[in-house]
């Protein structure tokens, strides 16, 4: 299956189980892999034959920056739901969400989740 990839999208949001996360917010890193049939676009060179990743980015940004979720698992699920609703050609989605600085003790590069959904 063909894929459209958005990697390292950075957004500021207020998601998390801790009060500090909900009031102070933090940066969220989002990676997306969208399974789409790109056959027509690969032949036509027309934007109308693909999924516009700029619009995908804006859609995800609105959810991450405008919504509030306790769990990033739920945020990821909401991203999948929204993208499936907005873009019928998307057949499957893999989304990864990471927090670089959650309020937990320890040394790590990031913590996060990854989920995959199919239409």
UniProtKB/Swiss-Prot annotation:
Keywords: Folate biosynthesis, Lyase. InterPro entries: Dihydroneopterin_aldolase, FolB_dom, GTP-CH-I_C/QueF. GO terms for molecular function: dihydroneopterin aldolase activity. It catalyses: 7,8-dihydroneopterin = 6-hydroxymethyl-7,8-dihydropterin + glycolaldehyde. Belongs to the DHNA family. Pathway: Cofactor biosynthesis; tetrahydrofolate biosynthesis; 2-amino-4-hydroxy-6-hydroxymethyl-7,8-dihydropteridine diphosphate from 7,8-dihydroneopterin triphosphate: step 3/4. It comes from the Bacteria. Catalyzes the conversion of 7,8-dihydroneopterin to 6-hydroxymethyl-7,8-dihydropterin. It comes from Streptococcus pyogenes serotype M3 (strain ATCC BAA-595 / MGAS315). Substrate binds at residues 21, 53, 72-73. The active site is at 99 (proton donor/acceptor). This is Dihydroneopterin aldolase. GO terms for cellular component: cytoplasm. The lineage of its organism: Bacteria, Bacillati, Bacillota, Bacilli, Lactobacillales. GO terms for biological process: folic acid biosynthetic process; tetrahydrofolate biosynthetic process. Its EC number is 4.1.2.25.
């Amino acid at each position: 299956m063909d894929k459209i990839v958005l990697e390292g999208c950075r957004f500021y949001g207020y998601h998390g189980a801790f009060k500090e996360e909900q009031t102070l917010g933090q940066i969220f890193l989002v990676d997306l892999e969208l399974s789409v049939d790109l056959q027509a676009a690969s032949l036509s060179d027309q934007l109308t034959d693909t999924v516009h990743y700029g619009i995908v980015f804006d859609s995800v940004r609105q959810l991450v920056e405008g919504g509030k979720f306790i769990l990033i698992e739920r945020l990821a699920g909401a991203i999948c739901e929204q993208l499936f609703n907005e873009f019928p050609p998307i057949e499957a989605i893999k989304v990864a969400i990471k927090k670089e600085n959650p309020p937990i003790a320890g040394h790590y590069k990031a913590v996060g989740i990854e989920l995959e959904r199919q239409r």
